[in-house]
Amino acid sequence: MRIVNENEQVFEWVNAKGKSPVVLVCEHASNHIPAALNGLGLSKAELKRHIAYDIGAAGVARALAQLLDAPLILNRFSRLIYDCNRAPEHASAMPEVSEVFSIPGNKNLTADQKQQRIDEIYRPFHRALEDALDKRAARSTPTAVVSIHSFTRIYHGQRRKVDLGLLFDRDDRMAQAFGAGPEGFVTMSNEPYGPANGVMHLMNVHGYARGMQHLMIEICNDLIESQAGQIEWAKHLAGPLAKIAEKLGDAK
């Protein structure tokens, strides 16, 4: 039995023909779990929590795509089925435990079950992004890859002070160019996560490997729970990213 119906797409493109050099990605956009997986054994309340998706990230990404005239790809399925920001061999790609929550539907998966999720979720999403970047490269279109994420204020009982995280691994060009972040908020590099946490998979595969500038952006989800907050933060991000995009365009 398929997880994803044959008439369903794993991904959604928004503003696919956008003119900006920035290509936006939101791989944790949705908490959707197909009926075939019976909610992975989780309650509706649990599926509304951060464990299932990045709260507010999709709204920020959609608003930002409009402000920048940038193409945006979103994942239409929950990261609990398969986390598209993890390599297939990574332990948290199909987590049995997320934060303090047990994920019954991910317990004791067979090799075939894991491969099915890789084939139906991971590969189509990454192939769609890869194809889009290939086409831009073939046209010599200046391109930078930016992914939009959110995180929780409280994690394992500890309060996080950071509001905006700029994440990078071996290439910090875009983080440096982004600057100090919006006034009145705490912006930090590689917080609350960093390369050591295995979170740079998508950026390394689609950004670093191509020599493209890239940046993973993390916003505390208590700032973007509402539509107003999502629009506000899209505006906060749009200014620095538009300047970076302008320089990329000038360098063509």
Each language-model region and where it sits:
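N-terminal catalytic or cofactor-binding beta/alpha core of small enzyme domains
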Residues: M1-V145, S150-K252
